[in-house]
Amino acid sequence: MNHKKKRFNKKKKRQRKRAILAIRILIVITVFVGVKFIPKRENKNLQIENNGTSDSEQSNNTEKTENKEEIETPKLDNSGYTSFEEDPNADDAAVVAANTKGLLNRTKTYPVRTDGKKVVYLTFDDGPSPTNTPGVLDVLDKYNVKATFFVVGTSIAANDQAKALLKKEVARGHAIGNHTYSHNYSYLYPNRVMNVNNIVSDLQKNENAMKEVLGKDFTTRVIRLPGGYWSWDGRTAMKEAMEQDGYYNVDWNALDKDAEGPKKNADQLVQCTKESVEALGPNADSVVLLMHDTYGKEETVKALPRIIEYLQSQGYEFRTIK
């Protein structure tokens, strides 16, 4: 009986030892696994810290990089002159030039626009002048209307006020066209024939004059030849030169006659404008109106509010040419 009891106790001790050994092995395995797991977690956390703690933070970092690139993009040195593509008030000079040319030489008839709108382009030649350009700009501001100024180099070079006015035209959202530097008919059109070399040289000289005021990156592809393109012989050679240099000449198909015949008062200029526009017919949907803001055109400034109101009453909206 004692012998059986001893064998039972020995067996129980062996089981206890095995259980203790199993527990120890389990503890060792647990510790080992924990040691292997913790560094991985730490490495993962370290990697996250290095790369960004979350997808949202990575997204923010990407946005910051993109914003930094946008900020670092150099701005054009052109006094803020916007391109045709960026200007909501501008129409394509290529289209306006083609439509006006077609209407003048009768290869096109109204309507010429494809959007159903009636549009008038107010254009002012020969400035800027300290006497009349400020008044024109003030009237345009009052009616929230944008215009296209065809400037002359000699007018720009005349004084610092004229230079400041050119900058003001740009700052107020108007379009700038090249009307040559000299505006000298005998130099540009000797014997009433276009001298292409002289014209191109004069246009380039005027663009350089504008760059000196507005900045080296300023450029305009819109030109208007003094007296109009169709007034002179030699147009074929000039057409080729314009195409080569990327110029678009935009003449006019309506005018207030402030540079024709005897000097007119404001009432007469308004009446001339009405007659000129009405002569285009009821379907006219693209009107390029010629006026001047140079010296001696005080009556044009006085007439301008009524001219704008008349055009508004006829359903026209005002756009620029770029």
Which stretches of residues belong to each language-model region?
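N-terminal pre-catalytic segment of deacetylase/amide-hydrolase enzymes
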Residues: 2-8, 20-122, 129-135, 142, ...
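Compositionally biased, intrinsically disordered low-complexity segments enriched
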Residues: 17, 49, 60, 180-181, ...
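Functionally constrained cores in energy, signaling, and assembly domains
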Residues: 18-24, 36, 40-41, 165, ...
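Generic hydrophobic/packing signal
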Residues: 24, 36, 87, 121, ...
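Active-site beta->alpha N-cap acidic-glycine motif
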Residues: 86-194, 204-221
